[in-house]
């Protein structure tokens, strides 16, 4: 079933109190916003605050060009600039939670994007270079999770906002 149809159908079953409202929202790019917040990668969060297109920013890093160059060419209808932005989206979705080349290939296929071997190799590398605090956060999460399993009942922090504890 079409997701929009499914949502429209499910909303028919919600009731609201008189004089109360009901809102529906899309948590746009939620996975790309939560991770930098958890990891303290504030420069990335600031791009959202500034209204920047994170996918174009990623693409500029992948293809060693500028945000302005890709944005200008996209506005002019350049299909290669559209491909570059799509690669930036793939990078965000595939690499944010430690995905590598296999994840890039999977997400690229889902986006209908054909990438060269060099692009597939380069996408995770440029992401990791651009987000050192996120990379450190991955290691902190792994370390805290292992320690929690090894030390039943004790709590271990990963960054400022995540705590691991084994209770079983």
PLM regions and their residue ranges:
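Conserved catalytic core of nucleotide polymerization and phosphodiester-bond processing enzymes
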Residues: 1-168
């Amino acid at each position: 079933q079409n997701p929009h149809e499914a949502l429209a159908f499910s909303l028919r079953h919600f009731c609201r109190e008189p004089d109360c409202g009901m809102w529906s929202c899309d948590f746009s790019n939620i996975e790309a916003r939560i991770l930098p917040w958890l990891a303290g990668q504030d420069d990335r969060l600031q791009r959202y605050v500034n209204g920047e297109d994170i996918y174009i920013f990623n693409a500029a890093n992948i293809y060693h060009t500028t945000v302005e160059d890709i944005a200008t060419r996209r506005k002019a209808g350049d299909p290669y600039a559209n491909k570059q932005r799509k690669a930036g989206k793939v990078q965000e979705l595939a690499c944010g939670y430690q995905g590598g080349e296999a994840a890039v290939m999977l997400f690229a296929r889902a986006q209908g994007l054909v990438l060269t071997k060099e692009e597939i190799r380069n996408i995770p590398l440029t992401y990791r270079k651009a987000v050192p605090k996120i990379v450190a956060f991955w290691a902190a999460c792994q370390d805290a999770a292992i320690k929690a399993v090894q030390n039943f009942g004790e709590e271990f922090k990963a960054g400022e906002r995540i705590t691991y504890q084994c209770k079983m």
